[in-house]
């Protein structure tokens, strides 16, 4: 499985609107491209999360514009189990690799 995690995603935010019309601000955890699926993916978490809160990560495939920008209308739900498994594997790798997740406490 080939993927590339972008380190430039820190400090990027996206507003999502739920089925009730409520807006929620999300931070970009990271993005990556899967050569196997020929799709790009974005993983988000709520911006209003305290340090000790459990974080629920949202994952979507997306189509960026020609400048590489992404809006909520560019996001697509992941519907296949195989895609979910792949995204979960990438997330697990990200969380286990201190160099990617920015966790310096292991040093």
From Swiss-Prot:
UniProt cross-references to Pfam families, sorted A to Z: DUF1292
Coiled coil, from the record: none
Alphabetical list of InterPro entries matching this protein: EF_Hand_1_Ca_BS, UPF0473
Family: Belongs to the UPF0473 family.
HAMAP family to which the protein is assigned, alphabetical: UPF0473
Descriptive protein name: UPF0473 protein Ldb1604
Species per Swiss-Prot/TrEMBL record: Lactobacillus delbrueckii subsp. bulgaricus (strain ATCC 11842 / DSM 20081 / BCRC 10696 / JCM 1002 / NBRC 13953 / NCIMB 11778 / NCTC 12712 / WDCM 00102 / Lb 14)
